[in-house]
Amino acid sequence: MSDNTTLPAPASNQGPTTPRKGPPKFKQRQTRQFKSKPPKKGVKGFGDDIPGMEGLGTDITVICPWEAFSHLELHELAQFGII
């Protein structure tokens, strides 16, 4: 046993050499973009056909939003954030 063999250096118990990663980072969600356009205000079929309102034109501003969107269902109003 007079061989002069060299033994490798003892392996270190430090684990992998890649840097340790922290917790996952979440991206901030951007505002939702609807594929369809939001509904337009105004009641369908509302205009000069009201007695006593002749001459005012069909550009009638509706004060109550429920009247402005009476042709829509509640889930449609909620989808676009109207209610």
Swiss-Prot record:
Coiled-coil annotation: which residues?
A: none
User: Which GO molecular function, any one, fits this protein according to its record?
Assistant: 3',5'-cyclic-GMP phosphodiesterase activity
Give the first-level EC class, as a single word.
hydrolase
- Which reaction(s) are listed as its catalytic activity? 3',5'-cyclic GMP + H2O = GMP + H(+)
Q: What is this enzyme's EC?
A: 3.1.4.35
Q: Where is this chain compositionally biased, Polar residues type? A: 1-17
Compositionally biased intervals (Basic residues): 22-43
Instruction: Spell out the GO cellular component terms annotated for this protein, sorted alphabetically and separated by semicolons.
Output: photoreceptor outer segment membrane
Q: Where is this region: Disordered?
A: 1-51
Q: Indicate the family of this protein.
A: Belongs to the rod/cone cGMP-PDE gamma subunit family.
Report the disease annotation for this entry: Cone dystrophy, retinal 3A: A rare form of cone dystrophy associated with supernormal rod responses. The disorder is characterized by reduced visual acuity, photoaversion, night blindness, and abnormal color vision. At an early age, the retina shows subtle depigmentation at the macula and, later, more obvious areas of atrophy.
Provide the protein name.
Retinal cone rhodopsin-sensitive cGMP 3',5'-cyclic phosphodiesterase subunit gamma
Q: Which organism is it from?
A: Homo sapiens
The opening ranks of the lineage are:
Eukaryota, Metazoa, Chordata, Craniata, Vertebrata
